[in-house]
Structures are given as C-alpha cells and as structure tokens.
Swiss-Prot record:
Key words of the record: GTP-binding, Hydrolase, Membrane, Mitochondrion, Mitochondrion inner membrane, Nucleotide-binding, Protein biosynthesis, Transit peptide
Species for this entry: Oryza sativa subsp. japonica
InterPro entries in the record: EF-4, EFG_III/V, EFG_V-like, EFTu-like_2, G_TR_CS, LepA_C_sf, LepA_CTD, LepA_IV
BP GO terms, sorted: positive regulation of translation; translation
E.C. no: 3.6.5.-
CDD domains the record matches: EF4_II, EF4_III, LepA, lepA_C
Domain of life of the native organism: Eukaryota
Name of protein: Translation factor GUF1 homolog, mitochondrial
Amino acid sequence: MAGAAALRRSARRVVLPGAYALSRALQHPERLLSSQASPDRGGVLGSELGLYPPERVRNFSIIAHVDHGKSTLADRLLELTGTIKKGHGQPQYLDKLQVERERGITVKAQTATMFYRHANNQLPASDQPDAPSYLLNLIDTPGHVDFSYEVSRSLAACQGALLVVDAAQGVQAQTIANFYLAFESNLSIIPVINKIDQPTADPDNVKAQLKRLFDIDPSEALLTSAKTGQGLSQVLPAVIERIPSPPGKCDSPVRMLLLDSYYDEYKGVICHVAVVDGALHKGDKIASAATGRTYEVLDVGIMHPELTPTGVLYTGQVGYVISGMRSTKEARIGDTLHQAKSIVEPLPGFKPARHMVFSGLYPADGSDFDALSHAIEKLTCNDASVSVTKETSTALGMGFRCGFLGLLHMDVFHQRLEQEHGAQVISTIPTVPYIFEYGDGSKVQVENPAALASNPGKRIAACWEPTVIATIIIPSEYVGPVIMLCSERRGEQQEYTFIDAQRALLKYRLPLREIIVDFYNELKSITSGYATFDYEDSEYQQSDLVKMDILLNGQPVDAMATIVHNQKAQRVGRELVDKLKKFIERQMFEITIQAAVGSKVIARETLSAMRKNVLAKCYGGDITRKKKLLEKQKEGKKRMKRVGSVDIPQEAFHELLKVSNSK
C-alpha cells in the first residue's frame, strides 16, 4: 500500500509543472498503469485526459495531392510534439500498409494524439512555465475519391484541416477535390505551402493560385519545408489559434462517430472513434445505431502513436475502442456508437458503401480456389467496403464477383492480395453498375454482363450508365489533345479555365465505363506525364448500350462478356478478337473467334489448326491413297473440334483489360 501511495504522489508531482509532462509520461504508460495504481475505469492516465476539456482539444486533418509532402509533414509534427523520436527510422509513420508506402497514398485512416504546450511566440519558453497544454488529434485520411465517403466521415470528426500544396507544382487536381470536401464539411482551412526549399519553388505563384481558385487570403498561407524543418514552428500554433474546439455536451450520454476499423488476430476489431458527447469508460455498454447490436467496452485509449490504454475518453477526444466485435462488417464507417439502452439521435451522414466497379477474381490454378477464398476472407476482415459473392464461370471455374468503391480501391485490393497473401488471380474485365429497363417497365441493375440474358422475348427499352465529373489540370500546350481524348471517350465539357499563364483546368462529365481501365495512362501519355486527374461521382445518364459476347467455336465465354456503347461495338469487337488470336495457342483443330452483339456477329478471326503431314510417307503411288489419308485426318479434326476445349491463357485476360476501354 505504501508503494501505491508513493506512486500516486509521484504521478501528482508529474502534473504540477503543467500538463506538458503528460506527453513524456504517455510515452511510457507502463510507469503509470501498474496493477496497483490502475483502477478499472482509467487509473492515473485516464484522469490526466480529464485535464483536457473540449476548449483545449483540437481535431484536424492534413489533406493534399499525391507527393505534396503530407506524410512527411505528419512525421515532423509527431516529432515536434515528442510523440515519436527524431530519426525513428520509419518514414511515413502513419502509413502502415506496404501498398501505402509504395504508392505514396493513404488507404486506411489513422489517428495520432499529440500533446503540445502553446506558448507566446514573443516570449522565451523558459519565461512561460504555466503555458497551457493542448491535446491535438491528427486524423490522417485517404485522399483519393474512391475513399471519399471515408474521408467525409473522418472530416466530420475534425474542425479544421491543413491544405498542403507543393511550392513548385502548385495546385493539382486532387488539391481541388480535397479542398471542396473540407469546405463542404465547414472546416477551418489553413493553407500550407510546402517544399519551399526546392530550387523551383514559387510560393508567390501558389498564393495567387489559392486566391484565384479558392478565394484564400495569401497572408493566411504558411511557408514550410517538412524536409528541412523550415517554418514548422508556426504550424501547430496556427492549428490552436485558427481551428475551433470540438462542440459537444460533456454531461450527455456518450455518443461516438466511428471513423475506421481494422482487425487484429489477438484483439478482434479495433475501432477508431471520435467522442462527440459524454465520456466513454472501460466496462461501459455501448450499442450501434446502424445494427442495433450491443457490446461491452473491453479496452479504450488513445493512439500515441500506438495503442495506449487510458480506460476513458472524454468529449471531443479521438481514440480507439475494443468491444468484442468479430468482424469489421459490424463496424460500419460513419456509424454512431452510443450508450446502450439510451435514446440518442444518430450522427448525420451515415450510408452504406456504394460499389462503383465490379470485377471477377478467379484463381490462376483452379486447385487454388480454397487458398484464394481464405486470402479474400482475411483481407476483407480489414476492408469491409469490398463486397464478395461466389460465382461460377464455364471458362474459369469457381471464383468471386467483387465490388469496389472505385478503380484505385480495386487496384489496391489486387495488390494486397498478391503482397500480403501470395495469391495469383485472374481478373475479368471491370464493369460498372448499369441499369436496364425492359419493355414491360421493370428495371434491373446489372453488375456482371454475363447475367444479362439475351432474351428476345424481353426487349430492352432503355439503359442508364453512371457518370463522373473529371477534373484535369494540364500545361496549356496540351489542351487540344486532351479535349480530343475526352471527346473520344464521350465526354461533355463542363468547364475550361486557366489557372495561370502556363496551366489550364478542364472539367468533363465522362461515363465511368470510359475511364476505368486506361484513361489515366493515356492522359499521362499525351501530356508527357504532366497531367493530374481526379474525379467525383455524378448522376446516371441514359445511353445506347449493348452486351457483347466473345465466342470460341460458337460457344460464349461468359468471363469475357462486356457491355459497350453501340457506336463503339464493332471497333471494340475487332480489337478483342485480334488480341485473342495472338494469345490463344494453336490447337490440333481450327478455332473460330467471334465477337457478337445478340445474334449478329460483328467481328471474326480464325486460328488455323496445327497440321501433321500425313502424306510424308507416300512416295508416288495412287492418288486415291493420299485422298483417303487426308479425308481421315479431316474427320478426326472435326471430331476434336466438337469435343475439344480451348485453353485461354491468363495473358489473354490481361490484354482484354487494355482493349475493353481503349479509345
């Protein structure tokens, strides 16, 4: 008992000089959370969090275009507050996944709690021992449009955002998209012009762009270099002074916004939450507004920067909750978690994931189906936004039809399957969700072209396809080729302006079908790599669409069926059969490759059979002997063609992906 009393006195002494000391204590929570001095409802560390009322809490995010220095800036802020050590040896600390580090993007939202003493910059810190300490929650969100719903939910937990812009590259397409996401969320936006140490940096030009595009006062911009540390000392004071504290009612029943979740093999589902009202304690009973299920809080704490148990979270604070959820499908992003058996109003904005791109995944080797099934099951434990249903293809066997939020989401999922689980898969042509209306007035949403039966008795009266609003920023000399590319992809121009003397901004409404494979690659090619591209979901529009089947020896290959615009059907069909002819190996029998719309064949190629010279041993003699041998060979090849199967190599499917959306 004497030891416990001494520990409590020691803990109180830590607090006396100011809450700044908590940051050091939190880096070694085991010193405070011993079995003797840690009551179930938070212990010493939990009571320290109580020193931070909402007025001394700031929740903010960092938003930027790819490679503008967002992750490096986050690292420097974590170092500046002592949350991680300088030279920690792990750049991009908050990017945990290998795919995030390789691509320089954020896929999973991460949070980090920092403690910062805000002193008067006009006076030396030694003269301000009682300067107030603030709790700062950095919520690192994905930046790509595929994850826009997750971003909107994460931004809903923030009151401000740092808008990072490269001092040399200036405003890019994703900068614009992210600004409007933050603007529509009513966040206080602090512009940060980064990389001012670069030889080509032009901060004044970037300030002018911010003024022209977003009406941001140039004097509000902070000039920094996350690499050298120049100007970083002004960032956190600006966060405290310009970003408001989180609203909330401390004396109300607990209400939390679920930001993200991931699965841990030992702890189950770990949820990142922002406490909007009340306080959450270990042992509390909570319920989900979306599912109605009830859970017991097994553990609660903050990310500092790793899981740090505190036993309690107060109003305005951001942290993690472990409550015994068995699957991330129970933890729906944007859901409201609240005190069980209490009537609370759910936080606005929750909606289920909307899948915009669908693709079939099949094992490269049919015997690996169980291994692929296990890999997808484990991966979806950490990505509940993927929809998975089993399907069977006559050409590829057993597989899965997966729905994704967008192109990048699909690409990242494939990469994680390969890197984290070693799965080798065949992907079918990506499709988007179409809506077809039949003559009798019934409507159906089609995600798999093979499911659209060519039924002559059920006439298709109308078709609708999803569209996007694409934002393209390019050097002005490439405007002509880009306009031509967008026109070829059935685009409608919405906006055409000049950002400055050298760069133009184009906005087009484009069918999602036209950009899901190679649009970005072709855009980069015709602009010598200078274009930046981003898009946001728009409405459905009526279109003239047809289903195209690929037939091998008269038999349709369901995995190769696709839906195309009627005007492009013949050209796309011609390119598909040409590609297949190059990649399908010759057999002992002739192979007919056809592209058909309904009962009409619009393109055809013939792969001739390999032929054995059956006359090699006939030296002269009666001609009827030679004819007999040739007729026998001909009959044998007919029989082989009738019962033989055509092997389609994996490379053929990869090539079809490139053709299906080519210009």
